[in-house]
């Protein structure tokens, strides 16, 4: 969906984080059987942007936070927000979806990778799907032995003004 959105600027131009999130939630709602997809949903001690739950047992399957790129410090705070406020011990699959406005996408991807490896909860890289989607192993702040899979997904919304 994200790559498709990059090719269709009308899906993201003029939208804020919540508007773009709603496009993703709408698509996720129809993609999986036995799964609910919601936006701005309370989990642990805050409202996460995207939450996928198993219909049968109401367990969390996936949690995602959406952010526009505003530099490395803002990005690292977004990771901390996700881990400190939204994850319980049972949550193991999470994502940070980063929307990059304007140009210099390659430079931003380099800064994202650098920032991830500097983060206090970072353990190691797990799998690189491509240049814009990388899976990492992080640890929970309250249980350093508990590993969490964090997918960083970057989207090049180059038609948006920075």
Q: Which functions belong to the PLM regions below?
A:
Residues 1-7, 47, 63, 69:
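Folded interaction cores of globular domains that provide primary macromolecule-binding surfaces
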Residues 24, 50-52, 61-68, 85-86:
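Conserved catalytic cores of phosphodiester-cleaving nucleases, focusing on short active-site segments
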Residues 54-56, 67-70, 154-159:
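Short, flexible loop/turn elements at secondary-structure junctions
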Residues 68-120:
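Catalytic cores of nucleic-acid endonucleases
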Residues 101-162:
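Domain-level recognition of nuclease-like catalytic cores that cleave nucleotide substrates
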Residues 47, 58-61, 147-149:
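Short, mixed charged/polar active-site loops
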Residues 1-38:
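Acidic-basic catalytic patches of nuclease active cores, encompassing PD-(D/E)XK
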Residues 25-57, 74, 142:
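Active-site metal-binding core of divalent-cation-utilizing nuclease and nuclease-like domains
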């Amino acid at each position: 969906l994200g790559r498709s959105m990059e090719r269709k600027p009308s899906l993201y131009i003029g939208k804020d984080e919540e508007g773009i999130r709603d496009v993703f939630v709408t698509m996720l709602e129809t993609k999986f059987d036995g799964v609910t997809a919601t936006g701005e949903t309370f989990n642990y001690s805050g409202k996460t942007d995207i939450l996928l739950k198993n219909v049968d047992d109401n367990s969390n399957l996936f949690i995602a936070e959406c952010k526009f790129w505003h530099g490395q410090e803002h990005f690292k705070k977004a990771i901390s927000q996700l881990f400190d406020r939204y994850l319980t011990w049972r949550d193991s699959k999470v994502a940070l979806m980063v929307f990059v406005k304007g140009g210099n996408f390659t430079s931003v991807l380099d800064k994202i990778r650098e920032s991830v490896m500097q983060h206090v909860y970072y353990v190691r890289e797990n799998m690189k799907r491509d240049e814009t989607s990388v899976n990492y192993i992080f640890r929970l702040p309250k249980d350093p032995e508990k590993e969490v899979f964090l997918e960083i997904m970057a989207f090049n919304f180059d038609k948006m003004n920075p």
